[in-house]
């Protein structure tokens, strides 16, 4: 479900590339930096026919707050039961500050106009994510 509690499917974007980026939690420092970088790159992404979908396990009601607070200009999706994350292989064991737990890994997928995964972005700093994506698109 998107921030307006409406269902969204990849097939809604046929003919466009989709950057499906998984992020752990709305309104946290790293996730905010990543989202704002994509927000500020929207014109360049539009030129490349790329739609951005941010996906987290946040409840739907949290997403509009993130959009409003940071003036985000793309769709956010709630995957509370992490079913989509599991399909993409980005849900699993994480280690942070000596703790181990299941969680969402920060990985992005560029999906081509036909719905096929074209590229996986899994090595980047949150502040550089947008530039890593743009560099790939411009090569």
Residue ranges and their predicted role:
Residues 1-139:
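Chalcogenol-based redox active-site neighborhoods
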């Amino acid at each position: 479900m998107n921030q307006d509690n409406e269902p969204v499917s990849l097939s809604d974007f046929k003919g466009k590339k989709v950057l499906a980026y998984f992020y752990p939690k709305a309104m946290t420092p790293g996730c905010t930096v990543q989202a704002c970088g994509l927000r500020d790159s929207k014109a360049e992404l539009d030129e490349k026919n790329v739609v951005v979908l941010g996906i987290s396990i946040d409840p739907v009601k949290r997403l509009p707050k993130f959009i409003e607070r940071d003036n985000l200009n793309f769709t956010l999706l709630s995957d509370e039961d992490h079913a989509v994350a599991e399909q993409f292989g980005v849900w699993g064991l994480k280690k942070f500050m000596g703790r181990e737990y299941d969680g969402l890994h920060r990985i992005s997928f560029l999906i081509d106009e036909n719905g096929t995964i074209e590229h996986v972005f899994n090595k980047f700093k949150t502040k550089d994510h947008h530039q890593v994506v743009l560099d790939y698109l411009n090569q």
